[in-house]
């Protein structure tokens, strides 16, 4: 299994992120996120990645959110937002994306993500479920959620 590492907020990571921008779409770019964290001198990095040798081949950002105001879940637990999961083309379908998601699940908190085009099968396989669309809350996104077994399931449907 691939080892997930917290990525340092520094110029080396900034250079590594540039290789993703070449292959990815603009909305997946994490360069701006990383640059703002560097400017703020934020040492608590939300970025995680997997290396193949010395090369960063998969990455994501993971943020813990205060659950007291969420409408995604039937509880007030804090949850994680998993953003911008991306694996370089030559390394896809080798378990790196799954390893990142399993790493996020290991925190034992519910997870919310916004899937990208053509990724529905991946998120289904990882156990994520759609929530009922809410125009004000979701603002054009189509969020998916995952909840650990010890927390009550909610698909966003009202009783």
From Swiss-Prot:
UniProt enzyme class: transferase
Domain N-acetyltransferase positions: 7-151
Entry keywords, A to Z: Acyltransferase, Transferase
Domain of life: Bacteria
Keyword Acyltransferase: yes
PROSITE patterns documented for this protein: GNAT
InterPro entries found in the cross-reference section: Acyl_CoA_acyltransferase (IPR016181), GNAT_dom (IPR000182), YlbP (IPR017274)
A molecular function GO annotation: acyltransferase activity, transferring groups other than amino-acyl groups
EC numbers on record: 2.3.1.-
Disulfide pairings: none
Entries under NCBIfam families matching the protein: PRK13688.1
The protein, known as: Uncharacterized N-acetyltransferase BPUM_1403
Organism placement in taxonomy: Bacteria, Bacillati, Bacillota, Bacilli, Bacillales
